[in-house]
Amino acid sequence: VRLLLDDNNTPGLDDILRLLDSHPRIEVRLFNPFSFRLLRPLGYITDFSRLNRRMHNKSFTVDGVVTLVGGRNIGDAYFGAGEEPLFSDLDVMAIGPVVEDVADDFARYWYCKSVSPLQQVLDVPEGEMADRIELPASWHNDAMTHRYLRKMESSPFINHLVDGTLPLIWAKTRLLSDDPAKGEGKAKRHSLLPQRLFDIMGSPSERIDIISSYFVPTRAGVAQLLRMVRKG
């Protein structure tokens, strides 16, 4: 299991990340990690230009067969698994050639210069962690976990998935992603998503459907969309 996380949202998780990374079949890496682990705001004072560049890409790919991409973060609030309010978001599940494209894009980020193996950021003493790999018994008996599992087992989506009857929409699909060099501030403008999206949109004759968790097109993007509207 390769887990690549943006380090911006990991405060207080260092021990958990150490534990995960100590497992022989799990490797954790961090995008643009903070040098100051406790007083993180100090990092913005001393290294703002680098730390202000974050990674919003989200993908979950299994065995090169199926992938999930979308806006959902890793957290109970995004899956209706906790007592806190539900954060609604969307994912796309895909099979076919695009899965390899997503895996290749993950590899681009996994090996880019802005990403560091966890062991370069945190000390991971193997001997100390070896005794903690076993999950606490309380995790297996957690009432909230069992409620969530029961919901999953009764979900029509899960039943369709298990039975191989999940209705799929077959379509031509293309993956677009920012150049990971943006983490160093070295990405060319034409290699970033806004320009590439408009290039692909071209001159549509009827309609464009855009689904986004937070769509921030900037002034130039708004102007481009308005030009399309005026053209009908």
Regions found by a protein language model. Give the residues of each.
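Charged, low-complexity intrinsically disordered terminal segments
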Residues: 1-58, 62-232
